[in-house]
């Protein structure tokens, strides 16, 4: 990996700040400064040097709840979302250790004063680490946000959430709207720091993600600094456009060591006017595991903004700056989307470049010109819609991860999402399941209860269940037990 001189990095303190000039700054310098700023923030926060954040500040009333796991803050209205955003940005409340749960879909149509939850909009040249991260758990409860629109060309590092640190964002869909900014822009999260988890989150086809410079992702713009993050059971259907390089269908860039992306898919067009574009992730700088993922969206690297060579890949876009010793693993993945690029871009349907990458049981749709590649196995596109291909993807798994769902992903295989984490159907020791009056009833002590449909959709607790088969997951006395229940 090439390193910029430390003196040069420190001299760029004003870069990427609202109102600063970036005319003479190269993309590499900008990337380096963003990473330096966030690393400085992490180090300062860990050392207790940052005093302008409060983990237990007085919280707004919201629509109920106490912010505990058992009794989370309830989010029902636009005002609840605005109150959360304001509490993080203006009241400096990180909500570390606090829990939120949406109770219904929320429409932001016509709402102009909602700002991304957790952001760095008030950073200054004197204090570039002055950012407001969200550090709690936000459960969308399988509800959707509609018509979320936020456009600011001078701001960076945002999506619906801006900057999150050690947070969990789960069970949330951003169905429609448009998010657009300068750099590090994501459909769900702008920047994920220090062990962030994004689980079962989705973007809709009526949602757009636009990034004027680098680090654009359908789910998260950049995973930067601190402990490894996890992106699990997420899909992107939102068209994504960037102009300066490093763009991925799910994630723009990863600089964390040990990040995992599992059971995720990109189905949207990913258009990069420069280079370094990937169907799943744009750029890798440290160790990462990508497992049971797919790209079926059109991925393009037009190389209009760069005179140097670039790269494009159906799974990973670029590994050229990966730190020596990084372990990059791709397992049970496939690429079936069109790859569009212009010379001198280096293309590979799985991952381009010479950095050592472990690729197991992964596939790509054969090229029309008959070109073959050493990374992955080529298969005819039409054969990817057959059960034989599903069986190939499931080789080496304890249970069937991949299935074909009618009307989903143009007939190509998809993971079973949440239920893929369920390996065994067994009986718990501290709690048991019964069917009473046609409804599922749990007897005994348990810590966590989750009910899923067989296609992996998590249902809100208390929902009226129709006749059919359900997966019930309990965590009791530290043991996870899973039941298949038929009503």
Where does each model-flagged region fall?
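Residues that act as N-cap/strand-start positions at coil-to-secondary-structure junctions
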Residues: 2, 111, 130-132, 155, ...
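Bacterial N-terminal signal peptides
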Residues: 9-18
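Serine-esterase "nucleophile elbow" of acetyl-processing enzymes
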Residues: 11, 23-24
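Bacterial N-terminal signal peptides that target proteins for export
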Residues: 1-9
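C-terminal outer-membrane/trafficking sorting elements
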Residues: 423-487
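Surface-exposed repetitive/solenoidal architectures
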Residues: 24-422
């Amino acid at each position: 990996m090439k390193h910029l001189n430390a003196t040069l990095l420190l001299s760029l303190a004003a870069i990427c700040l609202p109102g600063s000039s970036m005319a003479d700054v190269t993309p590499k310098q900008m990337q380096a400064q963003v990473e330096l700023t966030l690393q400085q923030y992490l180090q300062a926060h860990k050392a207790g040097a940052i005093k302008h954040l409060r983990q237990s500040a007085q919280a707004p009333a919201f629509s109920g709840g106490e912010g505990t796991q058992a009794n989370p803050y309830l989010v029902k209205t636009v005002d609840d979302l605005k109150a959360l955003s304001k509490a993080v940005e203006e009241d400096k409340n990180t909500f570390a250790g606090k829990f939120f749960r949406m109770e219904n879909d929320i429409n932001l149509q016509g709402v102009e004063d909602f700002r991304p939850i957790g952001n760095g909009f008030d950073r200054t040249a004197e204090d570039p680490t002055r950012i407001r991260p969200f550090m709690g758990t936000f459960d969308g409860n399988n509800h959707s946000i509609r018509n979320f629109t936020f456009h600011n060309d001078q701001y960076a590092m945002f999506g619906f959430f801006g900057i999150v640190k050690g947070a969990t964002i789960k069970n949330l869909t951003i169905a429609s709207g448009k998010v657009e900014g300068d750099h590090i822009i994501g459909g769900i999260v702008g920047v994920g720091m220090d062990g962030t988890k994004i689980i079962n989150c989705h973007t809709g086809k009526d949602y757009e993600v636009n990034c004027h410079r680098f680090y654009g992702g359908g789910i998260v713009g950049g995973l930067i600094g601190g402990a490894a993050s996890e992106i699990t059971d997420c899909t992107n259907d939102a068209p994504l456009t960037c102009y300066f390089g490093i763009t991925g269908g799910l994630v723009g860039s990863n600089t964390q060591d040990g990040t995992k992306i599992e059971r995720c898919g990109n189905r949207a067009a990913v258009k990069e006017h420069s280079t370094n574009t990937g169907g799943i992730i744009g750029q890798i700088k440290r160790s990462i595991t990508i497992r049971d993922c797919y790209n079926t969206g059109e991925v393009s690297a037009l190389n209009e903004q760069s005179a140097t060579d670039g790269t494009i890949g159906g799974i990973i876009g670029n590994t050229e700056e990966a730190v020596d010793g990084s372990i990059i693993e791709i397992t049970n993945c496939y690429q079936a989307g069109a790859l569009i690029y212009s010379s001198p871009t280096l293309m590979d349907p799985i991952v381009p470049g010479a950095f050592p990458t472990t690729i197991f049981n992964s596939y790509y749709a054969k090229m029309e010109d008959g070109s073959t590649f050493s990374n992955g196995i080529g298969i005819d596109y039409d054969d990817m819609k057959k059960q034989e291909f599903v069986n190939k993807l499931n080789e080496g798994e304890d249970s069937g991860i991949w299935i074909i769902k009618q009307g989903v992903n143009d007939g190509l295989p998809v993971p079973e999402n949440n239920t893929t984490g369920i390996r065994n159907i067994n009986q718990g020791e501290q709690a048991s399941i019964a069917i009473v009056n046609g409804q599922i009833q749990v007897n005994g002590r348990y810590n966590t209860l989750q009910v899923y449909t067989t296609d992996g959709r998590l249902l809100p607790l208390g929902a009226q269940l129709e006749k059919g088969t359900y997966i019930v997951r309990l965590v009791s006395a530290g043991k996870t037990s899973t039941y298949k229940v038929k009503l």
